[in-house]
Amino acid sequence: MKVLWAALLVAFLAGCQGKVEQVVEPELEPEPELHQQADWQSGQPWELALGRFWDYLRWVQTLSEQVQEELLSSQVTQELTALMDETMKELKAYKSELEEQLSPVAEETRARLSKELQAAQARLGADMEDVRSRLAQYRSEVQAMLGQSTEELRARLASHLRKLRKRLLRDVDDLQKRLAVYQAGAREGAERGVSAIRERLGPLVEQGRARAATVGSSLAGQPLQERAQAWGERLRARMEEVGSRTRDRLDEVKEQVEEVRAKLEEQAQQMRLQAEAFQARLKSWFEPLVEDMQRQWAGLVEKVQAAVGASAAPVPSDNH
């Protein structure tokens, strides 16, 4: 009997434990996009702009009453367009900055990296454009429903937005990897450029050091007065040379100024002669016309006066 009761007790406890295990829900794993978005907040300017686009898209995905209202008034698509343009502008500027640093890298390597990065950038832009197009399509479909239930449209939009967000995450991850390779190439190119400069300047620096050591050793054996006198002679010769060059240069400048002034005076004289000739030509054109108009005017005045005189003469009367 005791064995039976013990078996029943064990079965009861096992059932209770199974129910408890069914009630306990598993912990939700954090979304990977949260970690990625945290990196955007402290990254490059294009990543900061992308973070603002992502925050706004996540708010749109809630499909709250305010979101639906702004979707119908095209407010959402306008905001997304501005955020998209800002992101692509900052990304283009960052790519140009890296391209300048890639100049020491081989042309083939630079072309390959640029092509891969451009393809990743195009995918991101296309998917962002797909988000905007899908929201614009939703607005058109809702407006066409004419007050009917839009629950199915909202569910379908939410599903599309989830898929698009996953695609955007993949695009951004791929783009960041491409940019990292691009940046590594730029860093390698900069290091190569510095090494090349060192290789070129190294022999010159060594020659300068050797020359300075030679001059120092030669001057060390001379008395101080002789060294000062030698330096003074060199300085005087240098100043005379500079002064001679300066005087020659001033003479050249004076000659050029005189030549320019002579040309300007010649051109001014030519312009005066041309103006006088043009004035005389105008006078020869218009003087006959003015004289003819004066003659016509005088004839017209005489005719008018004659007509007025004839009309003012007394009319003879018929009464005798």
Swiss-Prot record:
The modification Phosphoserine is found at S149. Its main location: secreted. Disulfide bonds: none annotated. SUPFAM superfamilies: Apolipoprotein A-I (SSF58113). Residues 269-320 are annotated as: Homooligomerization. Heparin binds at L164, R165, K166, R167, G232, E233, R234, L235, R236, A237, R238, M239. Residues 281-293 are annotated as: Specificity for association with VLDL. This is Apolipoprotein E. It comes from Plecturocebus moloch (Dusky titi monkey).
